């Protein structure tokens, strides 16, 4: 799984990662080989690395693997047993749940250096959602038994996960209210602002740095694709946004905030 070679002043980790997951077209396994130093691991997962002792860092590094996913590839499926803590190093990921009639609801989106896929393990249950890559992604995977051992030994690390779960719960509560109590215009405006806050904008300071399909934007906003297309068109007519294919430029953010607030 992981081969470790010791040097005088540093440790190099040769990571061989093979992760098998189900997709509509069968199973996909991606083999990744990558050399990582302790400094590179520390840069990849700073929040996790910082509170650890030297011996704990060595133990974590020996169980640290890198995984790459293609665009639209499934990362984990609903009903699967959680095995790893995941941290997104590059790319964009959606957490979603399939609903009635084949429609999906995007529950949340993951940004760089964000940890996910661990709540179900703590709850001793299988995944109640699924995850997939919006675009090519690189992630680190750490076996959950390793995380549990470190938490039992390190109170600061335990507090880190308590804070993370608390923040995630707060975001989930806010999203639930927004998606169930707001009308279509308010939901779509909230989603556009949510994407800006999560992924930021490009150099022009207006264009969202994530290019979602109309279907994904609809699934994020709890509406049909046709409603998302129609509402986006209305926003463009009202000069709130500019649409260029999948690129969306926010022109009047203050009015979008008002629409989102009014609901």
Predicted regions and their residues:
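Cyclic nucleotide-binding regulatory domains
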Residues: 48, 73-136
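Short loop/turn motifs at secondary-structure junctions and domain boundaries
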Residues: 58-59, 75-79, 202
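N-terminal amphipathic/basic-hydrophobic helices that include classical n-h-c signal peptides
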Residues: 1-30
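Polybasic "coupling" helices that flank or enter modular domains
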Residues: 152-222
């Amino acid at each position: 799984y992981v081969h470790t070679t010791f040097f005088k002043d540093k440790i190099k980790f040769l990571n061989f990662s093979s992760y098998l997951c189900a997709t509509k077209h069968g199973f996909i396994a991606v083999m990744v080989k990558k050399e990582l130093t302790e400094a590179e691991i520390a840069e990849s997962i700073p929040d996790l690395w910082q509170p650890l002792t030297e011996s704990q860092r060595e133990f974590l590094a020996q169980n640290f693997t890198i995984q790459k996913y293609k665009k639209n590839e499934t990362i984990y499926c609903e009903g699967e047993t959680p095995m790893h803590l995941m941290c997104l190093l590059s790319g964009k990921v959606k957490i979603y749940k399939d609903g009635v009639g084949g429609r999906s609801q995007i529950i949340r989106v993951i940004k760089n250096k964000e940890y996910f896929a661990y709540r179900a393990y703590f709850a001793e249950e299988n995944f109640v959602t699924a995850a997939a890559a919006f675009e090519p992604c690189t992630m680190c995977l750490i076996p959950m038994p390793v995380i549990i051992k470190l938490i039992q030994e390190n109170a600061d690390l335990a507090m880190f996960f308590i804070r993370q779960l608390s923040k995630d719960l707060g975001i989930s509560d806010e999203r639930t209210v927004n998606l169930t109590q707001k009308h279509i215009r308010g939901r779509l405006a909230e989603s556009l602002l949510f994407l800006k806050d999560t992924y930021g904008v490009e150099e022009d300071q207006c264009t969202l740095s994530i290019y979602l399909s109309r279907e994904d934007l609809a699934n994020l906003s709890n509406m049909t694709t046709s409603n998302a297309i129609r509402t986006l068109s209305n926003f463009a007519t009202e000069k709130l946004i500019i649409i260029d294919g999948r690129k969306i430029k926010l022109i009047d953010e203050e009015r979008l905030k008002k629409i989102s607030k009014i609901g």
